[in-house]
Amino acid sequence: QEAEYSGVTMAEGLGRTVLHRSRFARIWGLGNRSAPVAQTPCLISASNDPEELLSIAPFRSSQTRTIPAKLTIDTVHCLTPPNFDVPGPVFEASIGHVLPPSLDEANAGESADSGSVLPLSWQRLHHDASLLVENLKPHIVVLVDAVQLAAQSGKLVQAIHVIKNKFPGALLWTPGLGGPDNAAVLAWFGVDIFDFSRAGFAVASGHLLTAFGPRVPLDGEECSSSVAVTHYDQSLRSVRSAIASGTLRTLAEQQSLNSPKLVEHMRFFDKLVNKSNNVMRIHPLGVDRIDYLSTTSHQDSSVEQWVDFISNQYQVPEKLDNVLVLLPCSARKPYRLSKSHRKFIQALGTNACHEVMVTSPLGLVPRDLEDVWPAAFYDIPVTGDWSRDELHRIKSMVCNLVDRHNYERIINHSGMDLEIEGFDVIDTRQGERSGSRNALKRLTDAVQTAKEELR
């Protein structure tokens, strides 16, 4: 469905093309795909916003004071296909009656419009059957009660997740919620359009809203709308750069530390995405490394789904489930290209053993899967120390792997203490370095003995 929205094939509406993607985040090129005039994540201005913002925001918004209110979104750019020769498009929609999200069992009555701009609220997502129509393809979705949802546990990410799955090709705006201090987090969830409301309120109260959170200006530092716009613009530029380079998750984790609420949103989002089954299907285009630098990143859905797959679905290649050899990981990927693993392979002297690398946060990486995403692309800080959670995860995965296969011998060269019921695990390290001469000789001897005894 996303492809149906993209590019310049539409006869009307908003021309846009996906330039980069990172999970739910997108950089959309706005206008003619051969020469986009703007990119998302971007700003949307209101009539009372500072001039500096009006000059860099590709969208403008206005809202009537009627009940229900009418929302208008337009642009000074020529974004309407196929010719892209006149300013536009101009979208209008009634917001309808919006009740507080806490009244999720209530029906607001008069619903909002359904068209090129689609205003949504928590109630509408629960009660409006017209949203199920297959040919409903909005250009912009506006989550009108985003601020209220952010104050209620888990509801914001639930609403965004539903919207991004139902309307993947629509731009998403969460009015009043975005700012330079949370742009990376919201973009990671899938938000595309940001307004100046919070940044403006901060300036009015004598504070600057920056990518690192709100702060009081330093002595001699100007606290003005112009400075606030600069901080906002730089924050969105950093977000776009992170999407393009595949590092948005890392930036979002850093920015989530600006407030407890952002950490809460990240955790709820991870739990929600972990329930889906499509995260590991696609290697993000242009991404040659994924960083798992913090304990928070260990809860990312790419990790959780890998752990679940290895623990419950992975099947050892035929005739290899006889001797299990546990090996340490290496910084270089794929592992076999590293100096240490070349030594291990030489010491083993056979490909008849099932080689499995012990690592964090993925837990276990079988040799036959070392070239796939994310196993071949992750990077972690290496200290040689294991946390309690890491030890529990790895030991649990080893036990699950052993329970589902017919191993007769387990050789442990990983350096981790492992006890597995029903097995006398052979420790070939015995406290020495994995690449030491004695440890490698013990590895060779253990494999040779297993081959002779298990013929």
PLM features per residue range, with description:
Residues 36, 186, 246:
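Conserved, mostly hydrophobic/aromatic
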Residues 48-52, 63-64, 83, 102-104, ...:
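Short acidic, S/G/P-rich loop/turn micro-motifs used as interaction or catalytic elements
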Residues 153, 183-187, 207, 335-341, ...:
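A short acidic (Asp/Glu
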Residues 208-260:
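Active-site or pore-adjacent capping/gating segments
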Residues 252-275:
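Terminal amphipathic helices with adjacent charged low-complexity linkers/tails
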